[in-house]
Amino acid sequence: MEEKNHIDHYANALYSIWLELDKKNKIIFTSSAKDIYFSLKNNYEMVHIIDSNIISKEEKTKILNKIFFDLSKSISNIYLKNFLFVLNDNNFFKRILEIFISFFQKLDEHQNFLFIRIYSPFVVEKKLLEKIEHLFSIKTGKRVRYENIIDKSLIGGMKIMFGNDVYDYSIKGKIDQIKWNIENNKEV
């Protein structure tokens, strides 16, 4: 729970910086934050390197500076670059992706968006994704964005997550529920 509080703390710090920026710099900041997020998500080894105890903090700072050197071109990106340095200095870089996800959720809330993750063992057809998007838009009264994430462990069906809510329509979820009911002597 303490790590979750730290994640929220750092995400709130990013959000506070974003709120202080003018419109142009908000766009640059958001775009750069997404670029960093996807770069690190797609190259997770980088997170492990920065989180490693083998490399000194000074070396990690040099690595971050070299990789994200272009970020220093605008004031909003200087904030992001310094934010990465703070995470490194505080030995919390391992949670960078979770921090960015929390930050993006705060932006979505600010802009009346709901971001949902649709987990399935296969790519869901666009028509079905649009139906899901429409249903959640009606249910929540918000504009909806979604991401279809492939999770082969689900076997079939899908699991939809947003915020702390989970709608599990997967075969794996049904099997897990039956298993739980049997273990707890509940009717199936």
Curated annotation (Swiss-Prot):
MF terms in GO: proton-transporting ATP synthase activity, rotational mechanism
Subcellular location: Cell membrane
Topology within the bilayer: Peripheral membrane protein
Pfam families: OSCP
UniProtKB keywords: ATP synthesis, Cell membrane, CF(1), Hydrogen ion transport, Ion transport, Membrane, Transport
Domain of life: Bacteria
Classification via Gene3D superfamilies: N-terminal domain of the delta subunit of the F1F0-ATP synthase
Intrachain S-S bonds: none
Any single Gene Ontology cellular-component annotation: plasma membrane
NCBIfam families registered for this protein in UniProt: ATP_synt_delta (TIGR01145)
UniProt record similarity statement: Belongs to the ATPase delta chain family.
Subunit structure and binding partners: F-type ATPases have 2 components, F(1) - the catalytic core - and F(0) - the membrane proton channel. F(1) has five subunits: alpha(3), beta(3), gamma(1), delta(1), epsilon(1). F(0) has three main subunits: a(1), b(2) and c(10-14). The alpha and beta chains form an alternating ring which encloses part of the gamma chain. F(1) is attached to F(0) by a central stalk formed by the gamma and epsilon chains, while a peripheral stalk is formed by the delta and b chains.
Function according to Swiss-Prot or TrEMBL: F(1)F(0) ATP synthase produces ATP from ADP in the presence of a proton or sodium gradient. F-type ATPases consist of two structural domains, F(1) containing the extramembraneous catalytic core and F(0) containing the membrane proton channel, linked together by a central stalk and a peripheral stalk. During catalysis, ATP synthesis in the catalytic domain of F(1) is coupled via a rotary mechanism of the central stalk subunits to proton translocation.
Name the UniProt record assigns to this protein: ATP synthase subunit delta
Species of provenance: Malacoplasma penetrans (strain HF-2)
Gene assigned in the entry: atpH
